[in-house]
UniProtKB/Swiss-Prot annotation:
Binds ribosomal protein uS19. It comes from Salinispora arenicola (strain CNS-205). Residues 104-177 form the PRC barrel domain. Keywords: Chaperone, Cytoplasm, Ribosome biogenesis, rRNA processing. This is Ribosome maturation factor RimM. The gene is rimM. One of its GO terms (cellular component) is ribosome.
Amino acid sequence: MLVVGRIGKPHGIRGEVTVEVRTDEPETRFAPGSVLRTEPGANVPASPGAYRVPSELTVETARWHQGRLLLVAFEGVLDRNVAEALRGTFVGVDRADVTAPTDPEEFHDHQLVGLAVVTSAGERLGEIVRIDHAPAADLLVLRRPGDRDVLIPFVRAIVPEVDLAGGRVVVDPPGGLLDL
């Protein structure tokens, strides 16, 4: 599953929820009628008789809220209590349904996660475990030996090469970046 958003808190009493967007194509992914898969294991109730998050949610409406969040209504989610049960659920699409980017310098998160990170001299630094989307630039989260994570700005000056076929990302970090 390619994660396109994370459901946040309910908004109002009619079942709308806030969604933290994790896609470059929110207008497509959250269009009315779009079917989104929920994270594996999301349908485990907190207690017997509690609302079970379905394996799929269908978007009824979506609109921007405060410029950074989407307010989304899903079919069948009609009140605040059910909306509250969705809080924290990741929603996504099947990777098979995602078209490859046409720009050779554009990548989907799932293409980068798991790649080895090496210096231009060939020294292995670790592995990419996730991508954080910050306002200024995306950040590669590099897992170093010893389970220590380092954030690397995904900009050409620091990441001159992405070799998907070779399973690696070449970095040229400025002094001290890997020590943070």
